[in-house]
């Protein structure tokens, strides 16, 4: 970058950073954006021509490169549209590469590779396997949106698990999820819309009221990325779920009432599933 303005020269130099898994990150957003795009483009090109990592072999350092990508997204560009970068990279490949057999399904292979690397990165950082899975599964449903928040969600989840009540919370949510899975096996048409007029028992009425309150609060907290307080909402809903399961027969004979109760449970699970999947926690 000789003869270029200082900021241009700095961007050119730093777009190669980080040079190693733990190397120094770019110092400016411009350098980070170019570095991120360049690294994703490199991964796309290698996959497109069949040079993806296999077993322990990674001659082009793509696994290490992914660590740099995740670090930059976390520190600089939390809302980076990774899937769009992948799409643009593959779209602009030379036609002769697009004709290769290895180009087929390259996007799916790249996405699978990146998610596997993200899981490995956070497990190597000391988070438990089920914690990582719990946070990554909801993120996967949203493409790559929000992967910059995975680390902070994991940190809050790790702290929440230290609470004495958290194991009981996991148990009650697993029970709720099992009912949903049982209903799906019976091909019941589950929605998250509850018909209030069909709620008869005091316990289900109280659960529904709390569900409405917590859902509104959750939406506000998640919009503000206040994940610690969002997790605390589990404590607000738990006693009402306990009371519901103790006093209400969910799988009753009346199909309308049964489906309505299942829908109530499904709505509660969906609210928390948007950022943490409690069903995979051990």
Positions of predicted regions on the chain:
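Amphipathic alpha-helical "coupling" segments that flank catalytic cores
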Residues: 1-282
């Amino acid at each position: 970058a000789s003869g270029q303005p200082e900021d241009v020269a700095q961007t050119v130099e730093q777009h190669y950073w980080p040079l190693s898994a733990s190397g120094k990150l770019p110092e400016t957003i411009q350098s980070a954006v170019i570095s991120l795009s360049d690294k994703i483009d490199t991964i796309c090109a290698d996959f497109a021509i069949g040079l993806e990592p296999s077993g322990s072999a990674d001659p082009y350092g793509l696994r290490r490169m992914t660590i740099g990508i995740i670090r930059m997204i976390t520190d600089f560009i939390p809302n980076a549209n990774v899937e769009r970068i992948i799409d643009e990279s593959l779209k602009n490949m030379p036609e002769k590469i697009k004709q290769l057999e290895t180009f087929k399904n390259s996007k799916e292979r790249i996405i699978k590779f990146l998610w596997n690397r993200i899981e490995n990165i956070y497990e190597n950082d000391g988070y438990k396997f089920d914690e990582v899975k719990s946070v990554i599964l909801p993120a996967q449903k949203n493409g790559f949106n929000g992967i910059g928040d995975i680390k902070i969600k994991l940190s809050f989840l790790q702290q929440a698990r230290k609470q004495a009540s958290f194991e009981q919370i996991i148990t009650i949510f697993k029970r709720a999820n099992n009912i949903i899975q049982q209903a799906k096996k019976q091909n019941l048409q589950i929605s998250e819309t509850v018909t209030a007029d069909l709620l008869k028992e005091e316990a289900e009425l109280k659960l529904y009221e709390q569900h409405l309150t917590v859902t509104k609060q959750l939406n506000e907290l998640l919009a503000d990325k206040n994940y610690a307080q969002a997790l605390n909402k589990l404590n607000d809903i738990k006693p009402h779920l306990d009371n519901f399961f103790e006093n209400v027969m969910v799988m009753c004979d009346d199909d309308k009432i049964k489906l309505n109760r299942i829908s109530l449970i499904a709505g509660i699970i969906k609210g928390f599933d948007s950022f943490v999947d409690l069903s995979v926690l051990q």
